[in-house]
Amino acid sequence: MTKQLKLSALFVALLASGTAVAGEASVQGYTVSGQSNEIVRNNYGECWKNAYFDKASQGRVECGDAVAAPEPEPEPEPAPAPVVVVEQAPQYVDETISLSAKTLFGFDKDSLRAEAQDNLKVLAQRLSRTNVQSVRVEGHTDFMGSDKYNQALSERRAYVVANNLVSNGVPVSRISAVGLGESQAQMTQVCEAEVAKLGAKVSKAKKREALIACIEPDRRVDVKIRSIVTRQVVPAHNHHQH
């Protein structure tokens, strides 16, 4: 009787433990220690599996039942942003050089004076520089004389100066010439007022002479130059003690 009770007690204990293991097994697929909550291993270090074990869904790497997921490939380095080269629009500088007709021509003439040749040669050297983009030669006259006559005279003078500059090395492709006659005469009213102040005692000839002298700035050739602004890169100087 006693032996049968002991066996019954052992059987109940086994059932109880089996129920507990089964409860754990349905979740883990392995026999799990109730105390440490870790998978139980045998003497060979192997994980104990139970009847509920499914290798495909429950296999563990530490038990040798699953392959560790490969390390994720590192994210590739982002490609550097392309370097955008912004072409800067060229900067221009405009300049006007006024040449007095008195230094270039005789009164009412369109042939260059001898001294004017030397001045134009120096100017041509400057206009031949590579940064010079365009040269516009404008002929101007004073208001005296007819519009038609002044227009023709201003054109002849502009062409004479332009041709001289070309003969001294200025590329013909960058130079142009135009006559503007008396259209930009600026001294007329001022000079007429000045001559009027001379009074009745001054002869007409003297007044005319004074007027011609006064309006001289209107008799001119303007050389209009457009150049590209060049940026000079100054090299750094190393200062050494000698």
Swiss-Prot record:
PROSITE patterns recorded: OMPA_1, OMPA_2
Pfam family, one: OmpA
GO biological process, one term: monoatomic ion transport
Gene Ontology CC entries for this record: cell outer membrane; pore complex
Signal peptide: 1-22
Ranges: Sequence repeats: 69-70, 71-72, 73-74, 75-76, 77-78, 79-80, 81-82
Outcome following mutation: V132I: In strain: CCUG 18241
SUPFAM superfamilies in the cross-refs: OmpA-like
Disruption phenotype: No visible phenotype when deleted in strains CCUG 37602 / M1080 / Serogroup B / Serotype 1 and 8765 / Serotype 15.
Main location: membrane
S-S pairs: C191-C214
Biotechnology note: Present in outer membrane vesicle blebs which are used as vaccines in human.
Subcellular location: Cell outer membrane
Gene Ontology MF: a single term: porin activity
Keyword terms: Cell outer membrane, Disulfide bond, Ion transport, Membrane, Porin, Repeat, Signal, Transmembrane, Transmembrane beta strand, Transport
Positions of region (7 X 2 AA tandem repeats of X-P): 69-82
Stored Gene3D superfamilies: OmpA-like domain (3.30.1330.60)
Domain OmpA-like: 92-229
Membrane topology: Multi-pass membrane protein
Subunit note: The C-terminus exists in a monomer-dimer equilibrium.
Family to which this protein belongs: Belongs to the outer membrane OOP (TC 1.B.6) superfamily.
Entry domain remark: The periplasmic C-terminus (residues 87-242) probably binds peptidoglycan.
Name recorded for this polypeptide: Outer membrane protein class 4
Encoding gene, per UniProt annotation: rmpM
